[in-house]
């Protein structure tokens, strides 16, 4: 009977927690809206008055993985919603955010997410000037082409970085796809730019990538604070793996020790797949099969 009572209490607490969570919008808490407003203000300074900036957020994930926003879109908005768009008008320094509409059925399983219906809340959390559904974006783009001079449209011409990704590795992957005669994959950014040029040929398309790259090199105090926290977690994970090392352990088990420390302390995952190499495997700088003996490890 005691076991049944405990299970019932836990079940009721779980249900109550789940019901409370349904009314909470999922949003990052590391940066205030002023941080993103400041970044967008610097973009306006770089592109000038006769320009618009159009940024495409990451698509939804396939399969049972957690969505992660692209680095570039998150850097300017903090928004972690799939299929979002950002439009910045250099003429009047206004910013419009475009989100999908609420999917009540999906939210019953995944929790409440930012949507086009959450105007006041989204503006408060992100500091943007306007919120619209994504279907409004084509109409708003056409407004810039009613009369010349037409503004220059800035967007990403390089692949956007996602979870555990870097641009050099993404470019290597695209090069491999191009060399495969059976793989006709085109980068999502390439398809987006082609769509812009087809639908709105009056726009001169320019690359936003160098501007964001230069901005992201210089870290704000809040970014430095997060980097220090992540570095401390990396050190804690390495120390835990070292303490756990003993004869007979496999590489993947040591990898799991460090990852446990990351996750239990609030990290969403690794910056990259750990390099946990033992024996002769340690000679390979980016080895990740994790099935040898003596260990050389890199975690982040």
Language model region names:
Residues 16-19, 291-293:
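Hydrophobic alpha-helical segments
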Residues 30, 239-249:
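C-terminal helix-coil-helix/basic helical segment that borders enzyme active sites and/or dimer interfaces
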Residues 61-68, 73-75, 194, 206-213, ...:
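Short catalytic-site patches enriched in acidic/histidine residues
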Residues 107, 116-118, 246-248, 273-275:
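Juxtamembrane/interface motifs at transmembrane-helix termini
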